[in-house]
Amino acid sequence: MIKLIIFDLDGTLVDAYQAVGQSVNYTLGRLGFAPRSHAEIKRSVGGGDRKLMVHFVGEKLADQALAIYRPHHAKALGLTGGVRLLPGVLGVLKFLKGKGYKLAIASNRPTKFTRIILKKLDVLFLFNMVLCADKAEKPKPYPEILWAIAKRLNLKNEEVLYVGDMTIDVNCARRAGIRMVAVSTGSSSKKELKDLKPWAFISKMSSLKAIVGADLVSAR
C-alpha cells in the first residue's frame, strides 16, 4: 500500500521555465554567447543548474557562469510570471494530503531555489520532506535521492510512488525499485516517456487523483 508520494519539481509541479530562460540568456549574454530559444532551454533542464551551464557554455566556463546565473535566477523567480503551479497541482496536493499520504519532493535543483519556489507559491507546508541534489548523496537519475527520502520517513520502497516529467525521472525510479507515474507536462515528450514504459502515464496532474483515489496503486 502506498503511503508516500514523491514528486519531482520543475515540469511536474511547477512551471519555472520563464525564469530559467531569462537567467540562462542573461548569463550567456554576460559571457558573450548568443541567446538560446525557450524551447532549447526547456529541453536542457533537469540535471541541475551546473549541468545546465555546462550544456550551454562548456565545462571550462561553468563555474563562472553559475556565479552569474544563480543571483539572477533568485531574482527572476520572484518576478510576476517567473514561476507558477502547473494546472491541477494544488488540488491534487491538497487531495492527497487530505487522504493521509505523506508528500515529498526530490529535485535536482539546489535547495535554495527549491525552497524559494515552494515558499513563493505557498505550498511548502504540504510536504513532509524536501530533498535536493546538493543535499543528496547523488543526483537523479541515481536512485539514492529517492531511497534517502523513503528511509528518512521510515518507509519501504513498495510503499512509495514517484511522479516526474522527464526520462531522467523514469530511470531514477526504475533504478530505485520504486513505482513511477510519468506526467507529460514538462521537458520530455509523451513518446519519450512512454517508450521507457513507466509504471503509469498521465498527461495532466489532475489524473493522478484517479490513480490514487481508485486505489489502483495497491491493486497493480
Name each region found by the language model.
Residues 4, 139-170:
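Conserved Lys-Pro-Asp/Glu-containing loop-to-beta segment of HAD-superfamily phosphomonoesterases
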Residues 40, 123-138:
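A short, structured active-site edge motif that brings together acidic residues
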Residues 161-201:
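Acidic, Mg2+-coordinating phosphoryl-transfer loop and its flanking beta/alpha structural elements
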